[in-house]
Structures are given as C-alpha cells and as structure tokens.
C-alpha cells in the first residue's frame, strides 16, 4: 500500500525601500517564493505468526501494537526560489520626497532664526545689565575717591595740628625753664651777704686811740608766684 501527496504553493511579496536621504532614488522589490512539498508513504502488510499472547507495556510497546511491523515514511521535501525586481519611483513619490526636503529645509531655517533671535535678546539683556553694573561701580569709585581725598585732608590737618601743639608745648617748656633760671638768679642776688669794715684812728695829745667794727647784713627773701 502506498500514497503520494504533492502540494504546490506560490507566495508573492512586494517591498518598497526608500533611501534615508529622501531623494527620488526609491526602489521597489518584488519577491516570488515557490514552495513544493512532497510526501511519500509506503505500508507493508505485517506477517502473522501465531504466538502466545504477550502484554506489552510502555510507550514503545503500545506504538508497536498500534502501527505494527513494516511501516516506513519519507520526510517532506521543501524547495523554493527568490527573484528581485527593481522599480523606478513614480512622479508622485518623487514630488512627495521633494516636498519633504523643502519642508525639512524650512524647518531647519526656522530653528536657526529662532535661536538667533533668542541669542540677540540674551545678548541685549546682558549688555544692559553689564552697563548698569559698570555705572554702579563708577559711582562707587567716585565716592571712594571723595572719601580718600577727605581722609588725606583730615590726616594732613591732624598732622599740622599735632606739630603746632608740639611747638606750643616746647615754647611753654622753654619759657618755664627761663622763668626758673631768672628766679634762681634773683634769689641768689637777694640772699647775698653785705659785709662792711669800719676803722677809726684818733690821735690826741693824751695818746692814740683806735676803734674798729664789722657789720654783717644778711637778707633772705622768699617769693611765691602763682600761675
């Protein structure tokens, strides 16, 4: 006993490939696949030999009881072929690709212009802020310069006043020294001792007479002066 089953199947697949650059070189591929299947089965009648009944257990024994002996089967054979067909893009697809490129270019220009406007705004804001800060710094420097001038003026005036006071003090001390020297000289003059020697000689007929004396005068004077 034999059986044969032949099955033929044809499959057609189309695929469109678009280049990433978006240009008009669009390719269309057509793939045709043919499948052929073949199955062959041959069965031989089993030979019957009388034998005592035997009970088979397990999967192998059960399969042998169901199928019996002499069963063979051939595997399926599959074959196929592939064919590629290159097609040129249509006018509509070319126009669509051109419009896509134009839209991409316009959007890119719009992004660049928007970024340029934002940078101009930021630059202008930064310039105004920098000018305001520079004006503040200039005014602070002017104030600092005025403070420096005032400080130098105060320092010079303070130095002049100190020198004047030192000169006045030195003159006062010199005057007091002169006053003390004059006072000492005056006191020395007043305390000087006056000495007088007197000697008298008297000659007469009766005889010779000598008379003498010494006078010492001391004067002390104290003067208190209040300033």
Swiss-Prot record:
GO cellular component assignments: cytoplasm
Compositional bias (Low complexity): 205-219
Coiled coil: 91-191
Composition-biased stretches (Basic and acidic residues): 1-15, 24-35, 95-126
UniProt-listed GO biological process terms: response to desiccation
Coiled coil found in the keyword field: yes
Keywords, in A-Z order: Coiled coil, Cytoplasm, Repeat, Stress response
Stretches for region CAHS motif 2: 163-181
Region (Helical): 95-194
Subcellular locations according to the entry: Cytoplasm
Domain remark in the UniProt entry: CAHS proteins contain 2 repeats of 19-mer peptides designated as CAHS-motifs that comprise each two octapeptides connected by a tripeptide.
Function: CAHS proteins are cytosolic heat soluble proteins that seem to contribute to the anhydrobiosis in tardigrades, but their specific mechanisms are yet to be identified. It is possible that protection during anhydrobiosis might occur via the stabilization of vitrifying small molecules such as sugars, but not via the direct glass transition of CAHS proteins themselves.
Note: Trehalose, a disaccharide essential for several organisms to survive drying, is detected at low levels or not at all in some tardigrade species, indicating that tardigrades possess potentially novel mechanisms for surviving desiccation involving tardigrade-specific intrinsically disordered proteins (TDPs).
Family per record: Belongs to the Cytosolic-abundant heat soluble protein (CAHS) family.
Assembly notes: At high concentrations, the monomers successively form oligomers, long fibers and eventually a gel-like matrix in a strongly temperature-dependent manner. It may be that under adverse environmental conditions, such as low temperatures, the gel-like intracellular matrix can sequester soluble proteins in their native state, maintaining their functional form until environmental conditions become more favourable.
Protein name (record): Cytosolic-abundant heat soluble protein 94063
Organism: Hypsibius exemplaris
């Amino acid at each position: 006993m034999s059986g044969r089953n032949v099955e033929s199947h044809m499959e057609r697949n189309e695929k469109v490939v678009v280049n990433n650059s978006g240009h008009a070189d669009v390719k269309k591929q057509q793939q045709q696949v043919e499948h052929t299947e073949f199955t062959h089965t041959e069965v031989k009648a089993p030979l019957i030999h009388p034998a005592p009944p035997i009970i088979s257990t397990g999967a192998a024994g059960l399969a042998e009881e169901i199928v019996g002996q002499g069963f063979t089967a051939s595997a399926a054979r599959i074959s196929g072929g592939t064919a590629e067909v290159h097609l040129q893009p249509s006018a509509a697809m070319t126009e669509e690709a051109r419009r896509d490129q134009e839209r991409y270019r316009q959007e890119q220009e719009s992004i660049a212009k928007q970024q340029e406007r934002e940078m101009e705004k930021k630059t202008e804001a930064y310039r105004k802020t920098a000018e305001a800060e520079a004006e503040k710094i200039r005014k602070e420097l002017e104030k600092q310069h005025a403070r420096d001038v005032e400080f130098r003026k105060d320092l010079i005036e303070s130095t002049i006043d100190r020198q004047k006071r030192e000169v006045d003090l030195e003159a006062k001390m010199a005057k007091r020294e002169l006053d003390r020297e004059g006072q000492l000289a005056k006191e020395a003059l007043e305390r000087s001792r006056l000495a007088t020697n007197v000697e008298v000689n008297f000659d007469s007929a009766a005889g010779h007479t000598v008379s003498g004396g010494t006078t010492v005068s001391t004067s002390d004077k104290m003067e208190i002066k209040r300033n």
